Amino acid sequence: VMRWRTIQTDQTGLSLVELLVSMVLLSVTLVMISGLYVSATRALGSASALGTNTREASNGMNAMARSIRAATANPVASPALADPAISEARNESLTLYAYVNLGLSTQQPVKIRLAVDAQRRLVETRWASIPHPGGLFTFATTVLSTRILAQTVAPSGSGLPLFSFADSAGVVLPVGSALTPVQLRSIVTVTVTLTVQSSTADARSAVTLSNTVGMPNVRLAVGGP
């Protein structure tokens, strides 16, 4: 009888309540682990996007600053005044003449356009020069090269304009409409504010760089300090 009672009262395994508690605890643990995994994945993704955008903004800024700094007026046969170094000045586009190293045996000017296209890419377009007697140059109508400096520039109106232009007195020129040749000749600095982000709709990892680039050749020509 005693042996039967011992067997009767010797319960092994988990009770229903213990099983339910274990399942709840396991579920909570799995939720916590999933949350940590998602958070870590998002953090790594944001860090990667931030690094990519930083490199792209830096490279794009360096390329633009190099071209703008080399801007030079383009002498023409007539009229006596040379064409302005910057022939187009807008908030999201500019066209200039510059002497930059193109790997040529003789240094010749190049026509460069920096502009944001319909896909919000920052694109550099170049045209080669055609030499003429008297040290004069015109420019080919066929594009020499095109390259993308930044894949996704922040939407227009979301911050400062990509380009703003100032004269030797530091006065910013309005570019709501096309500038006159006199105004274009007065430009001696270009402030570039470049914001690069992962997509036009995602600004969480956006990177903004700003740089005021002087044009020493133009400043010397207009007699600025």
Model-derived segments and spans:
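Aliphatic-rich helix starts adjacent to a transmembrane/signal segment
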Residues: 2-73, 224-225
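Residues that act as N-cap/strand-start positions at coil-to-secondary-structure junctions
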Residues: 80, 106-110, 207
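Type IV pilin-like appendage domain
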Residues: 88-174
